[in-house]
Design a protein with these regions (language model features):
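N-terminal lobe/hinge region of extracytoplasmic solute-binding protein
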Residues: 48-98, 126-129, 140-142, 199-201, ...
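Surface-exposed binding/hinge segments that line
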Residues: 106, 140-184
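Extracellular/periplasmic solute-recognition and catalytic clefts
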Residues: 147-149, 207-218, 235-298, 317, ...
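Ligand/substrate-recognition segments at binding pockets and active sites
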Residues: 211, 258, 340, 363-437, ...
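Gly/Pro-rich hinge or "lid" segments in bacterial periplasmic/extracellular proteins
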Residues: 81-85, 172-229, 233, 356-360, ...
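Extracytoplasmic/peripheral linker and loop segments enriched in polar/acidic and small residues
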Residues: 305, 320, 406-418, 423-425, ...
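Long beta-strand-rich cores associated with HINT superfamily self-processing modules
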Residues: 513-541
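Structural transition elements
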Residues: 330-365, 384-392
């Protein structure tokens, strides 16, 4: 068999990736990829992912890779453009009543599941019930959902007890996937084998998952969007090593990787490889702000003068440069400017970089320098999920040493980090990500709302912050249907937390996608590569 350069490189890369995988799995993986190459006639896209997802359907697991692989097979009612405006997917039209309590969706006709059965309103009803019961955010997102009905097979009506203005933004494939009701039972949904071999309505059909190696999807020839997808074979390659991902992109055996697939320090060197390009679009529904969070149960950190001093000691421009190599925007407020310009509070930093001021505030707070110049010591736990958080933590340690605060860094695996910070509350400071997600009520209420504090739930009010006015504003915004009034509520909330700083917002991180220039139309929605990639196109590079 004559091998093209692309096929040869792809197979060479696969052999490297499968070192340590059992022989039978290596053989199966090699055979499947060779077959895909023969059948596709060049219409193959290799997508690097890490870590390997635990499941391939995102209704009960919202890890980044689960969402990425799920949404190609299992779709949502809606998708969203980069301004977070709803667009049709499995629903072609929708109407929200004036009181915000009734949502009516018209479903796309003549859509079939990959097993040939018709898609109907029964699938939507089951899927929303499953999301409310099993999704990590489902009980909150659908808390006000009282009743679902189907007036006919292509109409679904939701009835709410109270308005939920964020609900219309929660219906993407990655957040609320629509599952085949005829293949699931609600009480056994988590154990269904289809979670690892999904059947959906999407542009790609599941073919195989060789654990530790790859997930292989093929084009759905019966997809409802005529002429799409154009890609014949989509292969998600599990590549935990960043050097391997970088080399794969360079040698063309990998076509694309998202969520900063290579060290950001390497991005400037990509100009040496003209077939590669970088995009920061397609992350608008999951904007992450790097933040320094305080444990307000610590006596010294409960003192606002100490928190103000720490804020004055931090140079956001340096963090942008050192921790994120420029792929970030400095910010003071916790709501993303890029994703929610109407909700973002554009405010001057009340605690600008000023080391002299920081030192004076610590003296005023009753923490004079002792022998050796030290005032007191703190521990700092860095969230391991993003290398930029770890680099930010190192910068914070250095910056605080200049004002006499001795910081001990704790770098841990994800499980240990969650136990130390959220379960056992052993931290003084933590550098982590605060995400507005697809709506501030969903993303930020868990961080700043006093009733969100729960040591059993990670990433929920680690500060143990309590401000009655903040609670009131967040509660009001959660049910406000007038967007202008809702914006005022969110801005008033930000005004308070920017001045009280239970958390110091530092920089909004840019998601980075590295891709072969032959690819296009993968970053046109707010979800980007986490969307269904139905429009993904292949040219030459």
């Amino acid at each position: 068999m004559k091998l093209s350069r692309r096929t040869f490189l792809g197979q060479t890369s696969l052999a490297t990736l499968l070192a340590g995988v059992p022989a039978w799995a290596r053989a199966a993986a090699q055979q499947s990829v060779e077959s895909a190459g023969q059948d596709a006639g060049g219409g193959i896209v290799n997508f690097a992912i890490t870590p390997e997802p635990p499941v391939l359907v995102s209704f009960a697991n919202t890890s980044g890779t689960s969402v990425t692989v799920s949404s190609k097979v299992v779709e949502g009612l809606l998708e969203y453009d980069r301004q977070l405006t709803p667009k049709p997917q499995l629903a072609t039209a929708w109407e929200i009543s004036a009181d915000g309590l009734t949502y009516t969706f018209t479903l796309r006709p003549a859509v079939r599941w990959h097993d040939g059965e018709p898609f109907t309103a029964a699938d939507v009803i089951f899927s929303l019930q499953a999301a409310k019961k099993y999704h990590p955010r489902g009980s909150a997102t659908f808390a006000n959902l009282e009743h679902i009905e189907a007036p006919d097979p292509l109409t679904v009506r939701l009835r709410l007890s109270r308005p939920a203005p964020y609900l219309i933004l929660a219906l993407a494939a990655g957040e609320t996937p629509i599952l085949p009701a005829h293949r699931y039972a609600l009480d056994e949904a988590l154990q269904n084998p289809l979670n690892s071999a999904p059947i959906g309505t999407g542009p790609y059909r599941f073919k195989e998952w060789v654990r530790g190696s790859h997930i292989l999807y093929e084009r759905n020839p019966d997809y409802w969007l005529e002429g799409h997808p154009k890609v014949e074979t989509l292969i998600f390659r599990v590549m935990p090593d960043s050097a391997a991902r970088l080399n794969g992109l360079k040698n063309r055996s990998i076509d694309i990787g998202s969520n900063s697939p290579i060290p950001l320090s390497e991005v400037p060197r990509l100009k040496e490889f003209p077939h590669l390009a970088v995009s920061t679009d397609g992350y608008e529904d999951n904007a992450t702000i790097t933040a320094l969070e305080f444990n307000l149960e610590r006596e010294n950190l409960a003192n606002p003068l100490v928190r103000q001093a720490i804020a004055h000691a931090l140079n956001r421009e340096q963090i942008k440069k050192i921790a994120f190599y420029g792929y970030a925007d400095v910010t003071v407020a916790p709501i993303s400017r890029r994703s929610f310009p109407n909700y973002h509070l554009d405010i001057a930093d009340p605690y600008p970089y000023d080391v002299e001021r920081a030192n004076r505030l610590l003296d005023e707070a009753g923490h004079p320098r002792q022998a050796g110049g030290h005032r007191f010591a703190l521990n700092l736990h860095s969230n391991p999920f993003n290398p930029g958080f770890v680099r930010t933590a190192a910068y914070v340690r250095s910056a605080l040493s200049r004002i006499g605060i001795q910081v001990t860094l704790h770098e841990q695996d994800p499980g240990s980090y969650i136990r130390s910070v959220y379960t056992n509350r052993e931290f003084d400071l933590t550098v982590s990500g605060v995400s507005t997600m697809f709506d501030p009520t969903v993303g930020l209420q868990r961080i700043y709302y006093s009733k969100s504090f729960n040591p059993a739930i990670p990433f929920s009010n680690a500060n143990r912050y309590h401000n009655p006015e903040v609670d009131r504003l967040l509660e009001a915004a959660a049910v406000e249907t007038d967007d202008g009034r809702r914006a005022e509520q969110f801005k008033a909330f930000q005004e308070i937390v920017v001045r009280e700083i239970p958390t110091i917002a530092l920089a909004q991180v840019h998601g980075v996608t590295v891709y072969n220039r032959r690819l296009s139309r993968f970053d046109e929605t707010a979800a980007g590569t986490r969307g269904n990639l139905a429009l993904l196109d292949i040219g030459n590079a």
